[in-house]
């Protein structure tokens, strides 16, 4: 794949050893940093390298700890704050100071908390159905609503429930979950997502960011209660047709087109 390199980074975050698998492309412009959602991987975003709308645009994507090809020596330490610190460590290792931010679902929440901590580094933010309110925990709240005896049992049942979901691409997503997530990574991440969504004042954090912002969502989720608030506060909305929570699977052409159009408006 032209221009894309794959590397592994040995990092230590909060005393925990990590091996982080990355995919990246260099260039002179400010890079895009992609943070994938739960049950996804960096490969969701590598097709950017084929898209003429991103010609010359560098990017960095990586598998979160406990996901994809990345490993974590203590999965019990995983949480959204831990993923934020991981993102900081990856950026430092890559020598990236300022960047455009794109995050999906879990990655969108991680991206929001990262942008909140370092707003001057974030040139723009595309939030693809990242958590902003309690209603966004339709996946993560299952750790509370569907109690299981152990991590493996919960994960097996979660995969089966997801497979039968009526939302577009859910079965496709479920088919690879066991290959992309370690069961021991689930509880800490899900509990953290629920806590922040319920009590983290995420909407205020998102609306207060100084950078240009887009909120992307699938047409099956066009009933999200806060969409009018986002539009009224100057956030660009991008509804992806024929899609639910996973536009990168259901309608990637439309997703990439909207991302490219948004970035064409940015000066760097």
State the predicted function of each range.
Residues 16-69:
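Conserved HGGG/HGGXW glycine-rich cap/lid loop of the alpha/beta-hydrolase fold
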Residues 185-239, 248:
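Conserved serine/cysteine hydrolase catalytic core
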């Amino acid at each position: 794949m032209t221009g894309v390199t794959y590397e592994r980074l040995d990092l230590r975050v909060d005393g925990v050893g990590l091996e982080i698998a990355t995919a990246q492309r260099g260039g002179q412009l400010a890079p895009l940093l992609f943070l994938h959602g739960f049950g996804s991987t960096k490969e969701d975003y590598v097709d950017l390298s084929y898209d003429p709308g991103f010609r010359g645009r560098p990017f960095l994507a990586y598998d979160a700890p406990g996901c994809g090809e990345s490993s974590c020596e203590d999965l019990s330490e995983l949480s959204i704050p831990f993923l934020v610190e991981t993102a900081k460590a990856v950026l430092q290792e890559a020598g990236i100071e300022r960047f455009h931010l794109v995050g999906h679902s879990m990655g969108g929440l991680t991206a929001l908390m990262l942008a909140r901590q370092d707003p001057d580094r974030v040139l723009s933010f595309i939030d693809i159905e990242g958590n902003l309110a309690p209603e966004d925990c339709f996946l993560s709240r299952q750790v509370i609503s569907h109690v299981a005896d152990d991590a493996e049992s919960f994960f097996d049942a979660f995969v089966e429930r997801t497979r039968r979901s009526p939302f577009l691409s859910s079965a496709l997503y479920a088919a690879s979950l066991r290959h992309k997530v370690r069961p021991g990574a689930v509880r800490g991440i899900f509990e953290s997502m629920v806590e922040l969504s319920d009590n983290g004042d995420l909407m205020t954090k998102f609306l207060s960011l100084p950078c240009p912002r887009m909120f992307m969502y699938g047409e099956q989720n066009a009933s999200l209660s806060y969409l009018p608030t986002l539009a009224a506060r100057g956030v660009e909305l991008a509804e992806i047709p024929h899609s639910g929570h996973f536009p990168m699977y259901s309608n990637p052409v439309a997703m990439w087109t909207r991302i490219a159009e948004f970035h064409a408006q940015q000066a760097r």
